[in-house]
């Protein structure tokens, strides 16, 4: 092998080139590569965190939905109980009103019955007096008296 000055010069130039690249070119390239690796790692970590946050949000939403459904069920049950209570109160009130109206109607019927009896008594008394007057006027005849009494009984 022949070592001449050209090979030696090329070797020195290559070594200087490598040294220059290692000193001035390689560090910015490595910094850019490391920066990019860090950005990618941060992006992946951020995506993982976002995925976990999404899972937590889904779980939280599911829990809140279950709680909301339970609350809705409780509210519906309370509304049904209140509806039943209102219906019972309305039935009770209607029953009381019916009882009151029936009692009032019976009282009115009884009052009308008493008034009718009193009116009937007055008419009977008037008829009895009229019959007595006729009997007194015709008291001479026994057959006429029994005829007047029969007519009076028929009128009553």
From Swiss-Prot:
Under the cellular component aspect of Gene Ontology, which terms does the record hold? plasma membrane; proton-transporting ATP synthase complex
Q: Where in the cell is it found?
A: Cell inner membrane
Signal sequence range? none
Q: GO molecular function: any one?
A: proton-transporting ATP synthase activity, rotational mechanism
What is the top-level taxon of the source organism? Answer: Bacteria
Give the transmembrane ranges.
11-31
Q: How does it sit in the membrane?
A: Single-pass membrane protein
Annotated family:
Belongs to the ATPase B chain family.
The protein's role, per its UniProt record: F(1)F(0) ATP synthase produces ATP from ADP in the presence of a proton or sodium gradient. F-type ATPases consist of two structural domains, F(1) containing the extramembraneous catalytic core and F(0) containing the membrane proton channel, linked together by a central stalk and a peripheral stalk. During catalysis, ATP synthesis in the catalytic domain of F(1) is coupled via a rotary mechanism of the central stalk subunits to proton translocation. Component of the F(0) channel, it forms part of the peripheral stalk, linking F(1) to F(0).
Subunit details: F-type ATPases have 2 components, F(1) - the catalytic core - and F(0) - the membrane proton channel. F(1) has five subunits: alpha(3), beta(3), gamma(1), delta(1), epsilon(1). F(0) has three main subunits: a(1), b(2) and c(10-14). The alpha and beta chains form an alternating ring which encloses part of the gamma chain. F(1) is attached to F(0) by a central stalk formed by the gamma and epsilon chains, while a peripheral stalk is formed by the delta and b chains.
NCBIfam families on file: ATP_synt_b, PRK05759.1-2, PRK05759.1-4
Q: What is this protein called?
A: ATP synthase subunit b
Q: Which organism is it from?
A: Salmonella gallinarum (strain 287/91 / NCTC 13346)
